[in-house]
């Protein structure tokens, strides 16, 4: 009997050690926030600004810019902002957030999981589930603030984040208003291509084959390849929407070194999860 207890005790200690190791290995990496103003837009004199972080239910830490009106009194309505898809909070989502704070809202612009200053490995990865949770976690954060009226929380999704915002709003009655700005449905874009140009069995198979080959290549090289950001140099015959992307992300107006759209884009397989999911 004594020997049995000894074996059980050893097993418990071993299991505890394994659990501690797993916990240490899966612990979210500590993120480092840039405290200097490095936005692509001027700082407003009408609002106070600070960097904040909050957790998602996937255990990731999101970095956000918090904007509060200097004239704030009592509990205020609040807005969470994100997008465009592949952009960061230092770009237009931050400008939207700051502008809405000037108009009396407490706002945050956040970096989605795996991008910008937020945590998550490998970098530049997208997921319809995780990205929807990003918005819900932002609502969690705002709803717990003492200066926020939790009954008046809204979200703004820009470009590809417009579809994600709508998906989040269908799941969370705490979201009282939703705005989708120049919306793309990223599930449809990844599945069918821009303007449904690849809406055929042959095109979809080619996409799946390319993703599979990219995964194999990454495994062999033991690194993740990037798909590339906005095309540079800009072809003369580029469609207007590509010219619009270039005019923002690749010029001083909107370029930022942490932005995938401004630099090397998503991982080659980083948006694969969107292809067989539909928001709308």
Identify the residue ranges that each predicted region occupies.
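N-terminal cap/lid segment of alpha/beta-hydrolase-fold proteins
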Residues: 28-74
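Short beta-strand element of the alpha/beta-hydrolase
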Residues: 74-84
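The serine-hydrolase catalytic nucleophile loop
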Residues: 86-98, 112
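Conserved alpha/beta-hydrolase
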Residues: 99-119
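Alpha/beta-hydrolase active-site loop
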Residues: 125-146
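Alpha/beta-hydrolase fold nucleophile elbow
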Residues: 147-159
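Alpha/beta-hydrolase-fold enzymes
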Residues: 166-251
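Conserved serine/cysteine hydrolase catalytic core
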Residues: 271-280
